[in-house]
Amino acid sequence: MAKDVFSVAIFFIVLRETLEASIIVSVLMSFISQTLMDKDGNVTDPKLKRKFMLQVWIGSFTALFICLAIGGGFIGAFYALDKDIWSGSEEIWEGVFSLIAVVLITVMGFAMLRVSHLQEKWRKKLMKSIANRKAKGISNWGKKYSMFLLPFFTVLREGLEVVVFVGGVGLETPATAFPLPVICGLIVGCLIGYFIYRGGNVMNLQWFLIASTCILYLISAGLMSKATFYFEMNKWNHQTGGDAGELGDGPGSYPFKSAVWHVNYGNPEMNSNGGYMIFNAILGWNNTGTYGSILSYIIYWLFVAFIMFLMWYKERRAARLLIAKLGDKVVDLEAASSHTPVQSSSSEDEFKINSPTDDKGDKAIDIVTEVRESSSPVEEHKDDKTVDVINEIRESH
């Protein structure tokens, strides 16, 4: 029979976890390719690109090896001791790994949105993180191996879930129904990630960054909600004495005291709900909404929106201040070139420059960020390029 050869439940379990991991890894690889690419589509530093791609692959395969070892140990203990030692801590594992992924994805998303303005600067930062081999401390280590950490924790979390969930399903599934759905799930998930990677390489950089960041934040917001729900379910399972979420959709399968709403269908923990399992992996769907999971989802988006507004405001404000400070230098150069006296002014109002916008504003923001992140004084950045940008902005007003 077909069910003895191909288990649909195993296929969707593997596809769900592979899909989430492949999306994050493919977006990260596209980010590296786009950052180290010039306007003509040529790689500016092939050696640096290979090093960071290698970090991504090493992080992914290291996590895969670890999760196979840990997951295999849990499954081996289950069959040897006839006791599912994973079930007592499953939600804790998932919740902790989800929170780690949320932090890493959120930080990466904020960084990616600035790449279009600071592509060359990001290339230099990536180069420094590799070159600074003598740097010590956790912070420097994290920067140096940043492209290793995100795929490592992502693949570790997803891979561990695959091994344990597939092992759990295997209790009621013939051994012959394992290989084909696992292979097919891995292939389909990896193919989707590959197409995202290829699409990210041919897309316009700005559109790619916006689209990929939106996808990452959708996944991250779902992970935030799921992490909260995992901790709530861990408490509920200890109160009920079992894994209540996998017993069905009715009363007793969810913490009803903290539930805001619940529907008796679409439970992503049920292996027969393949489509809802995919929604759970990408968007964080759950058929039960608790106060904690809903509030954490909303608070996460409010936090992201606040940080983005703060970044936008600080860049615009810094641009205005820098333009005002460079005003005297621009005026002096204009006076020298035209041999006509020009009244100098250093105040922002007298200089009559509003907040930069559009392309000229982007150029000013590049300079502002370079000055702000540099340890040298502002006066050292008054080069011809800066003066040209200031002149363009003045002429537009």
Curated annotation (Swiss-Prot):
This is Plasma membrane iron permease. It is found in: Membrane. Disulfide bonds: none annotated. It comes from Schizosaccharomyces pombe (strain 972 / ATCC 24843). Belongs to the oxidase-dependent Fe transporter (OFeT) (TC 9.A.10.1) family. The modification Phosphothreonine is found at T340, T357. The chain crosses the membrane at residues 61-81, 92-112, 177-197, 292-312. The keyword Transmembrane helix applies. It is a multi-pass membrane protein. The modification Phosphoserine is found at S337, S338, S346, S347, S355, S374, S375, S376. The lineage of its organism: Eukaryota, Fungi, Dikarya, Ascomycota, Taphrinomycotina.
